[in-house]
Amino acid sequence: MVDAEMAAFGEAAPYLRKSEKERLEAQTRPFDLKKDVFVPDDKEEFVKATILSREGGKVTAETEHGKTVTVKEDQVLQQNPPKFDKIEDMAMLTFLHEPAVLYNLKERYASWMIYTYSGLFCVTINPYKWLPVYNAEVVAAYRGKKRSEAPPHIFSISDNAYQYMLTDRENQSILITGESGAGKTVNTKRVIQYFAVIAAIGDRSKKEQATGKGTLEDQIIQANPALEAFGNAKTVRNDNSSRFGKFIRIHFGATGKLASADIETYLLEKSRVIFQLKAERDYHIFYQILSNKKPELLDMLLITNNPYDYAFISQGETTVASIDDAEELMATDNAFDVLGFTTEEKNSMYKLTGAIMHFGNMKFKLKQREEQAEPDGTEEADKSAYLMGLNSADLLKGLCHPRVKVGNEYVTKGQNVQQVVYAKGALAKAVYERMFNWMVTRINATLETKQPRQYFIGVLDIAGFEIFDFNSFEQLCINFTNEKLQQFFNHHMFVLEQEEYKKEGIEWEFIDFGMDLQACIDLIEKPMGIMSILEEECMFPKATDMTFKAKLFDNHLGKSSNFQKPRNIKGKPEAHFSLIHYAGTVDYNIIGWLQKNKDPLNETVVDLYKKSSLKMLSSLFANYAGFDTPIEKGKGKAKKGSSFQTVSALHRENLNKLMTNLRSTHPHFVRCIIPNETKSPGVIDNPLVMHQLRCNGVLEGIRICRKGFPNRILYGDFRQRYRILNPAAIPEGQFIDSRKGAEKLLGSLDIDHNQYKFGHTKVFFKAGLLGLLEEMRDERLSRIITRIQAQSRGVLSRMEFKKLLERRDSLLIIQWNIRAFMGVKNWPWMKLYFKIKPLLKSAETEKEIALMKEEFGRLKEALEKSEARRKELEEKMVSLLQEKNDLQLQVQAEQDNLADAEERCDQLIKNKIQLEAKVKEMTERLEDEEEMNAELTAKKRKLEDECSELKRDIDDLELTLAKVEKEKHATENKVKNLTEEMAGLDEIIAKLTKEKKALQEAHQQALDDLQAEEDKVNTLTKAKVKLEQHVDDLEGSLEQEKKVRMDLERAKRKLEGDLKLTQESIMDLENDKQQLDERLKKKDFELNALNARIEDEQALGSQLQKKLKELQARIEELEEELEAERTARAKVEKLRSDLSRELEEISERLEEAGGATSVQIEMNKKREAEFQKMRRDLEEATLQHEATAAALRKKHADSVAELSEQIDNLQRVKQKLEKEKSEFKLELDDVTSNMEQIIKAKANLEKMCRTLEDQMNEHRSKAEETQRSVNDLTSQRAKLQTENGELSRQLDEKEALISQLTRGKLTYTQQLEDLKRQLEEEVKAKNALAHALQSARHDCDLLREQYEEETEAKAELQRVLSKANSEVAQWRTKYETDAIQRTEELEEAKKKLAQRLQDAEEAVEAVNAKCSSLEKTKHRLQNEIEDLMVDVERSNAAAAALDKKQRNFDKILAEWKQKYEESQSELESSQKEARSLSTELFKLKNAYEESLEHLETFKRENKNLQEEISDLTEQLGSSGKTIHELEKVRKQLEAEKLELQSALEEAEASLEQEEGKILRAQLEFNQIKAEMERKLAEKDEEMEQAKRNHLRVVDSLQTSLDAETRSRNEALRVKKKMEGDLNEMEIQLSHANRLAAEAQKQVKSLQSLLKDTQIQLDDAVRANDDLKENIAIVERRNNLLQAELEELRAVVEQTERSRKLAEQELIETSERVQLLHSQNTSLINQKKKMEADLSQLQTEVEEAVQECRNAEEKAKKAITDAAMMAEELKKEQDTSAHLERMKKNMEQTIKDLQHRLDEAEQIALKGGKKQLQKLEARVRELENELEAEQKRNAESVKGMRKSERRIKELTYQTEEDRKNLLRLQDLVDKLQLKVKAYKRQAEEAEEQANTNLSKFRKVQHELDEAEERADIAESQVNKLRAKSRDIGTKGLNEE
């Protein structure tokens, strides 16, 4: 990552990674790999140095400080090249050793780079200053980055954990460990800050929580200030040390959004509340309150602002330079507000804190002449009592005179001052601890939300390892916790990692890193360990700290290597024992441990607390359980009952839960390092840091990372992600197993195939290889995208070029035309043509102008209209767009809901499958357990028999002891003059008797008894030795006593082993039980979540049911409106019948009036015809109305059914489309993310290209340097050739080899130049060739170094040869002068010379080997280049395939976009049609109401006519004149009659016209109705397209209905107005009637008219009677149908209610069944669990038996082997003796030979050279024989020693086998007891299961009955519905 990319980190960049300039400087820095080393140093551990010389296995070097030191060669360690300076991951170092790690950390720390990767974990060093590396800019830069993509940081660790959680769907944990003051708390806060920020990015919409106090992420962050105020304090090493441990779990939803959080705390240091060391202080909250930042607090708490006024908090320092208590108080108070604490809760906490300060000031004194305490002043007590809501006198009385329970009564007990002070401190500590725990619980309640949570990330911040001058019980608990965490780290890093390799079948040799801390852990927590002994001592009333110390020393001193006796130093606190922890040796002081562990309280004061008026204090102690055991006489304090639980036991329980939680997660480790003890920024204390690195296992973690396979991927995931590297290796359409596909793919890649291994399910990679594959993948994607971009740019360029060509052609045509015009424009005829041409067209032009003006006018009008239309359409478009947006939002919401529902459904299905599989597995295990239970029962009986035998043995031992006692008494009678030692012997024997009884009572005292018996035996032995001369009889008794002691010792050891094994197995079983309980709880939680989701789905279904019911209610409203129309029609029928009745009355009156004329008869006939016509019209209208109503009812029913079906279909189609949409959306997101990654990879590759060019330049310069060095070597070789003498032939051969090496180097240099040119030409392959260039450069450096070594060796060889030549010359001269005397020296010189020649030959061979290796390197590079070219071609092919896929995807996307637009247009058209239908319906209703109004008008006219007839009748009756008189005026009346007749005809014409209007209105009504039906049919068809908007359409219909209602009201208003007009017309008509009456005074002319009228009336009466009969029949039929319909509705409602009741009963029964089923399932699971435990015990018993058998066989074999080895030893001893004799003989022979040699020398002086040579040959032969004999002798001695060791090993193995046999036998006894307990539990579980099964069957029976009742009710409902439909059908047919 270059500087430009680091710009994203802002001002933090220099503190995270070194700059590009610094990296270049490091690469060019001079460095000598052979001379630059590290040497050890007493003060600094290691220092850098330069080697000056090497001599005799020692090295002389000059340190960087100028000091010259000489050290052994094996103590010298090489430095890494400068390019590795400040490396970010120390696993990448070339030379991995302690000084390399130390100096890398030191150099990074000097540049303020405090974070460094160390293999799989991160190391951070406390900077002791603020660094700008935690701001929001840095958080954003690290979000979503891989570990290799960003510098080391705590944010990177956090983001990796977050990504692992989402991808692996596994809970994560981050363990931040280190010593106190190393920076754990700060890093924990940064982790929480990071998670809160990235979770808030995905959840910004949730601004405020239900509390209204702040967002969830704010609350999580603000929990820290509150916890730190009450739980952090200043210590010697840390100003803000956490004095409690916390495990913060941050829960996330399935999508990674923040869901909730919770905090678990461990081991608050209560003692700090009342006591602090000098350099420390109390918890921060005390000093924050006293800072006077909030003066109202001081007034409320009745305190001053001086800390020294309060004893509890002023024992150490009171201020800290780095902490502003005033600002911290405001931060704490603000944190309480954000966390939702009420004012009352905050004030209560402040009051209790102030009360504790006043508590420390309460003083007490002794009463005069009494050992009784009394208060020394009550002021402080009054203040404390006031703040705590207590009575001051009661508080003081409870402290000084507490009430204790003795038997069944309470008595008052006196207390001395020391006891009262202790009780006061204990109460203060208890109040503070419980208040702290309450605060944590309150914070957890705030952080707990109702949001669904899927996974969590736990952050562990626990008190670091502590080594103080004074270490007490709290330090032991803290250090024990850190020991367990370090063991967890070691086990995870070094054991589980290697076990994973074994499990996957990878060839791996197990490496023991020596990091096992189990011995120290067992010493603390196992039975008879420190905590076990402490708890045991707490049970005994008279136990003290010293008895606890004595037991510790008796059990562990000398027996455990981790337990030591301390060295007390003057000036330091006393220490009682020492423990060797992983971080160092700690001296512990045990004063007060028993009290701290029991933690007793004054119960009288606690009872006052329970009754306090301060609610918080009373709630804190509401659940306190006191001491119920009565006090016996002579005993000081009461013992706790069965509920007693010590602090150590509680801590171990919490610690075991924590470790269980951590084991269930994927851990990430952060190691915090403290750089110095003085808190100085930038200073590294080398010894201190090295000690922490060694303890933390940093080097071992790096080694396992480098040697092992830290990265692993499942085969399927690997194939999916990396197939792009070589798609041809895994064909697309062919099925290939994932593992085979991965093997083919990796085999086809150009990588080191030794860097990965194939397991059974995963492929494993060494460190760095996975990163290389990622780089190759990024490069491949970059090439593909580059190709796509090139093709796209090519297409665009070709399109632009085509446009340019077309433009050019157009320009050429224009130019040609202009040139032609310019050639003819001056031609006279052309000028004439130009002048005449306009004149010819002037007339036409004028016409055209006129037409154009008209056209312009029209267009202008059209434009105005179109503008108006456009504006109208724009307004409509705006409204439609708004509606569309609303619909889209609604659709999006529905899609989101549907997606969530589908996701929940899938999760439920998966969980169901998993649970079913687990149920099946547990069932099988239960069956196996039952079988094994029977077998174990039989074995249990056998073991009980063995136990009875053991009891008999114990009885025999008791008898033996009784005999010993008798003999002891007899001895006492015989020997009266025993000394004081004999008296001591008597006391020891008495103790032995008591201890024997104690052994029978309790096996827990076995170990103490054993020690006592050993002391007794020793004393007895001493007494026996002293008194052996005086008491011979006592000797026999003592021997018997020894035998008894041995028997007891064996029995005790056996019992002790039994006890230990039993306790261990119990603890293991408890752990297993806890794990299974937690699993059950987890499964219960998952089941509850599933039930909640099911309830949500049911709620959604109920909502849909409500919507359907609303639609049905709407339909019923429409039916009611239709019924109203029917009632209106019935009213019309009633009016018609009334009219008929009135006509009948008129006809009767006319008949009474008498005769009728012919004119009247004709008029009657005419009116009768008119009435018949009107009746037929009315009947037709009635039939039409009935038919219309029937059709409407049928249409309505059909439409309702079709709408229901369409709604169902639409729901299914909607689900399908939403699913497809989500799939395409996911694909689009994937493609988008891939494009972004490809673009980023391209940018990275371009930057890498520039870097590679720089590296090429460096490589070129280095190659030139290499060439110069080769030339220098060639010149040196020429010089050496001139200097060599006699060895010229050999040297020539060597020089030829050297020249060959030189040529190879030159050739290699030339190849490098070629490679450089190829790199320049092949830009696309730069990334791959970069690795080759780096390796080549490294090889070149190594070759140059090797060449220098060869040159030096060669120069040394030449010097040796020249020296040898001189020596040869000297020896030649000396031999000539004195050959015989110097023969031996000459031989030695020859040997030396031969040795040197041999060394030279070996050097030459080494040079040859290096040359061959260079040749191999060259070939390898050529092969890599060829492979890279193949990769390039493959990448091109993959790019083409990807381009094709991209085009296909674009097509699919375009199709879906088109479908979406079509659906939108269809939606708009359907909305328009709906609006048009609503307007048509409104018009239709208006027309219908107008027809009703016309009908009313006709009725009124008819009524007026009837009144006119009645007036005429009255006039006829009143006229008593004679007919003669009437005849006179007949003529006048006839004239008037004609006028009236014409008027009547006009009225009839108007009546006919109105009837025509009615008919036309009826026809229009029918047409509109038909049109409406047609459009409704079309609407039904289009409802398929408007599926998502049916609810909106219903709303629009509701709106239109409201509009219709308003229009109907308007029509009624118009109707009333018309009725008023009609009344006025009626008045006018009455006036006309009066005129007619005056004209009708002459009745004669009207008699004929009356007769006609009478006839017509008769006909009308008859017709009216017929109509009345028909109407009566129809009304009766209608009434019957109406009654039946009402009865059917009542029946339907009754059945509906019964059905609902049945369904409710069914639901309740189902719930009961489900509850019983869950109970039964839990019982079955318990049963299976017990069966699994039984099977495990069975297997353990079988394994134990098998191990016993194996041990017996091994013992037998060892005995035989021992016998054989003894025989071999004897043989070897004989051989050795023989060889010794031969050696002596050979020595004698050598002496003889030496004597003969002397004689030979004398003869040589005389005899010459031949005799000397013979003697020398003989001497050499003898020397060879002597050496061979000595070798054989040495080998025989080695064999003898080896045999002795083998015998010892076999003896030891036999002893171990015997011990194992005894231990296994004890284990069998123990397991038998466990089997019995499990059998009992299994029987109980089986009984409970049977009970639940019977309940289940009962409920199942009730459920069946309820279902039967529901079926019966449903069948009745169906029958009634069918009957209702039949009746309705019959009624319609009859009508």
Swiss-Prot record:
Sites where the protein binds ATP: 178-185
Region (Actin-binding) location: 655-677, 757-771
Compositional bias (Basic and acidic residues): 1923-1935
GO MF assignments: actin filament binding; ATP binding; calmodulin binding; microfilament motor activity
Domain Myosin N-terminal SH3-like: 32-81
InterPro entries (alphabetical): Kinesin_motor_dom_sf, Myosin_head_motor_dom-like, Myosin_N, Myosin_S1_N, Myosin_tail, P-loop_NTPase, XRCC4-like_C
One biological process term in Gene Ontology: cardiac muscle contraction
PROSITE patterns the record matches: IQ, MYOSIN_MOTOR, SH3_LIKE
Modification N6,N6,N6-trimethyllysine, positions: 129
Coiled-coil intervals, chain numbering: 839-1935
Residues with Phosphoserine modification: 1137, 1269, 1510
Compartments (UniProt record): Cytoplasm, Myofibril; Cytoplasm, Myofibril, Sarcomere
Residue segments, region Disordered: 1907-1935
Modified positions (Phosphothreonine) in chain numbering: 378, 1282, 1309, 1513
Residue span, IQ domain: 781-810
Protein keywords: Actin-binding, ATP-binding, Calmodulin-binding, Coiled coil, Cytoplasm, Methylation, Motor protein, Muscle protein, Myosin, Nucleotide-binding, Phosphoprotein, Thick filament
Keyword Hydrolase recorded: no
Record keyword Phosphoprotein present: yes
Matching Pfam families: Myosin_head, Myosin_N, Myosin_tail_1
Modified residues (Phosphotyrosine): 1308
Comment block on domains: Limited proteolysis of myosin heavy chain produces 1 light meromyosin (LMM) and 1 heavy meromyosin (HMM). HMM can be further cleaved into 2 globular subfragments (S1) and 1 rod-shaped subfragment (S2). The rodlike tail sequence is highly repetitive, showing cycles of a 28-residue repeat pattern composed of 4 heptapeptides, characteristic for alpha-helical coiled coils. Four skip residues (Skip1: Thr-1188, Skip2: Glu-1385, Skip3: Glu-1582 and Skip4: Gly-1807) introduce discontinuities in the coiled-coil heptad repeats.
Miscellaneous: The cardiac alpha isoform is a 'fast' ATPase myosin, while the beta isoform is a 'slow' ATPase.
Family statement drawn from the similarity comment of this UniProt entry: Belongs to the TRAFAC class myosin-kinesin ATPase superfamily. Myosin family.
Subunit structure: Muscle myosin is a hexameric protein that consists of 2 heavy chain subunits (MHC), 2 alkali light chain subunits (MLC) and 2 regulatory light chain subunits (MLC-2). Interacts with ECPAS. Interacts (via C-terminus) with LRRC39.
Function text: Myosins are actin-based motor molecules with ATPase activity essential for muscle contraction. Forms regular bipolar thick filaments that, together with actin thin filaments, constitute the fundamental contractile unit of skeletal and cardiac muscle.
Protein name in UniProt: Myosin-7
Organism: Bos taurus (Bovine)
The organism's taxonomic lineage, starting at the top: Eukaryota, Metazoa, Chordata, Craniata, Vertebrata
Name of the coding gene: MYH7
